Amino acid sequence: MAETCKMKYTVFHSPLGKIELCGCERGLHGIRFLSGKTPSSDPKEAPASPELLGGPEDLPESLVQCTTWLEAYFQEPAATEGLPLPALHHPVFQQDSFTRQVLWKLLKVVKFGEMVSYQQLAALAGNPKAARAVGGAMRNNPVPILIPCHRVICSNGSIGNYSGGGQAVKEWLLAHEGIPTRQPACKDLGLTGTRLKPSGGSTSSKLSG
């Protein structure tokens, strides 16, 4: 748990401003936007370069992997599909809860170039009536971008809120992935079957615990 972990921190410079990463030897704990930088309307900015607080030898593997993943994401998001994800060791991943189940399902199922509604994600997590609880899980996501809560939208097609950095950041991330932010209603997007991959399959990420 967080209180017993020896935490390490690093700051990553991105087109969205500074992003703080924190983790321990057992896994990544958090990704946090530090600055309220208004993202450019054009996501094709200069590649991000990480700024490390402390030498690379001081960083646990989880932070090294997360830095590598984010650097690839901001340069070419599709390239992240072949990269390993860090182990996750935030307390939310150490207990059996609906929030953990929702976040894990989102990470495994909703891939690059895809979106899902809150209600659809609730169904994927085993409770189709829990759309509001899914919204709470998105607000409590400790590792935004890595677990792509920006790909979860409202059933009416609006993109909804984004606690990771505000609606402008959510729009930027979707545009960066080549997803139009002005969409028809979610039920018309063909998200089940055609836009979403089957819930089976494997992922290279792992929960540490």
From Swiss-Prot:
It catalyses: a 6-O-methyl-2'-deoxyguanosine in DNA + L-cysteinyl-[protein] = S-methyl-L-cysteinyl-[protein] + a 2'-deoxyguanosine in DNA; a 4-O-methyl-thymidine in DNA + L-cysteinyl-[protein] = a thymidine in DNA + S-methyl-L-cysteinyl-[protein]. It is found in: Nucleus. The active site is at residue 149. Residues 35-57 are annotated as: Disordered. Its cofactor is Zn(2+). Binds 1 zinc ion. Belongs to the MGMT family. This is Methylated-DNA--protein-cysteine methyltransferase.
